[in-house]
């Protein structure tokens, strides 16, 4: 995991002219990937994913990779930062920013236009604002102290630390397991003890578009998509991951589909309990995504919101008009 301090990361983020980054963000099930692919196909662009779970190989149905959507008229639109690490590992913000810059520089060096697309607000904001990152070591003593605490107690501790740090790094409602909560507390504690010097940020030059979907339509699409993913073999996918040696605790750590379906597979939940709890969790997740994006606006990011109900042609024309 990484800590954020808004200052230039290194020399290649400082004073170097950069191609303006097109960014498309929005909550889950709003159609942002389809829009990014259609726009990329029209502009000859390449897509950089901003999804914290699509980086994992073999985690396909549960993360909604839908790689067939990147093919338009038989031609694949190039994409980056999907399927780059093994399941069971812990990918983090520090690695994402490093990998993003490598992909961005590669795309620009070939004269192409990069499009950043995803729903992981923390990743997007760190890239757009050019946050400097440093790794946070594990704190065995603190972990031992927190071991055995309930998720409710851990969440309250995290809230108190966030207030002390004036931190927006961790959305407490995203911390849906004790393992995640302990790591978040570890990071916030480190931040409190190692206050970083604040300097002006060196942002990536970007124009940001958001897809605004009607709340009830979003809920309908989320529920429909969950049924489709289960029908398409999401349970079998998670069984395969477990059979390949990925620990249940690692899959639970990834949250949402991987948390609840794993708990079903190992017998902790019935199918009906899994389905009901997972559906609620995804709806809550989409709400938290919108909360983060609104927070980005309050922190100075200008987001041009597009009605998700518009036809694809109108959305693309509106984006092109503003480029």
Question: Which residues are covered by each model-predicted region?
Answer:
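Phosphate/pyrophosphate-binding catalytic cores of soluble transferases and nucleic-acid-acting enzymes
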Residues: 1-323
């Amino acid at each position: 995991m990484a800590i954020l301090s808004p200052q230039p990361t290194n020399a290649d983020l400082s004073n170097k002219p950069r191609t303006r980054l097109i960014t498309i963000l929005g909550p889950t099930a709003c159609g942002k990937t389809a829009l990014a692919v259609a726009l990329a196909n029209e502009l000859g662009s390449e897509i950089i994913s901003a999804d914290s779970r699509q980086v994992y190989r073999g985690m396909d149905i549960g993360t909604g990779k839908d790689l067939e959507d990147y093919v338009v008229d038989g031609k694949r639109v190039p994409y980056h930062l999907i399927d780059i690490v093994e399941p069971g590992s812990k990918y983090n913000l520090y690695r994402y920013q490093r990998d993003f810059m490598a992909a961005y520089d590669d795309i620009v060096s070939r004269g192409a236009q990069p499009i950043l697309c995803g729903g992981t607000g923390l990743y997007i904001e760190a890239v757009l604002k050019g946050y400097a990152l440093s790794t946070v070591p594990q704190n065995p003593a603190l972990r031992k102290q927190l071991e055995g605490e309930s998720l409710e107690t851990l969440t309250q501790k995290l809230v108190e630390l966030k207030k002390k740090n004036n931190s927006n790094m961790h959305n407490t409602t995203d911390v849906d397991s004790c393992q995640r909560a302990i790591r978040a507390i570890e990071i916030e504690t480190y931040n409190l003890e190692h206050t970083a010097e604040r300097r002006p940020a060196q942002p990536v030059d970007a124009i940001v578009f958001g897809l605004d979907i009607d709340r009830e339509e979003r809920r309908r699409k989320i529920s429909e998509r969950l049924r489709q993913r289960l029908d398409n073999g999401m349970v079998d996918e998670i069984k395969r991951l477990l059979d390949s040696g990925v620990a249940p605790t690692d899959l639970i750590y990834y949250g949402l589909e991987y948390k609840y379906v794993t708990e079903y597979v190992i017998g902790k939940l019935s199918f009906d309990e899994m389905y009901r709890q997972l559906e609620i969790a995804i709806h809550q997740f989409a709400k938290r995504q919108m909360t983060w994006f609104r927070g980005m606006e309050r922190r100075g990011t200008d987001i041009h919101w597009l009605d998700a109900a518009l036809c694809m042609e109108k959305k693309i024309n509106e984006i092109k008009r503003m480029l």
